[in-house]
């Protein structure tokens, strides 16, 4: 196989797959006051069953807050205290902070999978 053909195969493989597939968090960035309820929405357009919320604090790895295995099916992760979730639609999994506190200052990540 010549270098030109190999380059073509690599480009085809990189371009394969659903390019519109995405997981989004809204809002992307958020600064709030202590005690004011807030909701961060996670949305996915891939019809995935499993969705999860994580937080990452300085010097620590990702820690799971809550996860959902399908609509109306949620369970606690490693650090659920101070958070609530709901899953009324397959594509959305909002994370609710009823009364945010300084110890909840963190990076938050949402994920989905089959």
UniProtKB/Swiss-Prot annotation:
Residues 1-21 form the signal peptide. This is T cell receptor beta variable 27. Residues 22-114 form the Ig-like domain. Its main location: membrane. V region of the variable domain of T cell receptor (TR) beta chain that participates in the antigen recognition. Alpha-beta T cell receptors are antigen specific receptors which are essential to the immune response and are present on the cell surface of T lymphocytes. Recognize peptide-major histocompatibility (MH) (pMH) complexes that are displayed by antigen presenting cells (APC), a prerequisite for efficient T cell adaptive immunity against pathogens. It holds the Pfam family V-set. InterPro entries: Ig-like_dom, Ig-like_dom_sf, Ig-like_fold, Ig_V-set, TCR_beta_variable. Disulfide bonds join 42-110. One of its GO terms (cellular component) is T cell receptor complex. It is found in: Cell membrane. Alpha-beta TR is a heterodimer composed of an alpha and beta chain; disulfide-linked. The alpha-beta TR is associated with the transmembrane signaling CD3 coreceptor proteins to form the TR-CD3 (TcR or TCR). The assembly of alpha-beta TR heterodimers with CD3 occurs in the endoplasmic reticulum where a single alpha-beta TR heterodimer associates with one CD3D-CD3E heterodimer, one CD3G-CD3E heterodimer and one CD247 homodimer forming a stable octameric structure. CD3D-CD3E and CD3G-CD3E heterodimers preferentially associate with TR alpha and TR beta chains, respectively. Keywords: Adaptive immunity, Cell membrane, Disulfide bond, Glycoprotein, Immunity, Immunoglobulin domain, Membrane, Receptor, Signal, T cell receptor. The keyword Membrane applies. Gene3D superfamilies: Immunoglobulins (2.60.40.10). Coiled coil: none annotated. Glycans are attached at residue 103. One of its GO terms (biological process) is cell surface receptor signaling pathway.
């Amino acid at each position: 196989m010549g270098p030109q053909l190999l380059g073509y195969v690599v480009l085809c493989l990189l371009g394969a797959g659903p390019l519109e597939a995405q997981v989004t968090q809204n809002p992307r960035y958020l600064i709030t006051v202590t005690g004011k309820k807030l909701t961060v929405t996670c949305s996915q357009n891939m019809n995935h069953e499993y969705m999860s919320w994580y937080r990452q604090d300085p010097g620590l790895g990702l820690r799971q807050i809550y996860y959902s295995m399908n609509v109306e099916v949620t369970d606690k992760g490693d650090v659920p205290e101070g958070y609530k979730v709901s899953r009324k639609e397959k594509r959305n999994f909002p994370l609710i902070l009823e009364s945010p506190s300084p110890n909840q200052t963190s990076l938050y990540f949402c994920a989905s999978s089959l």
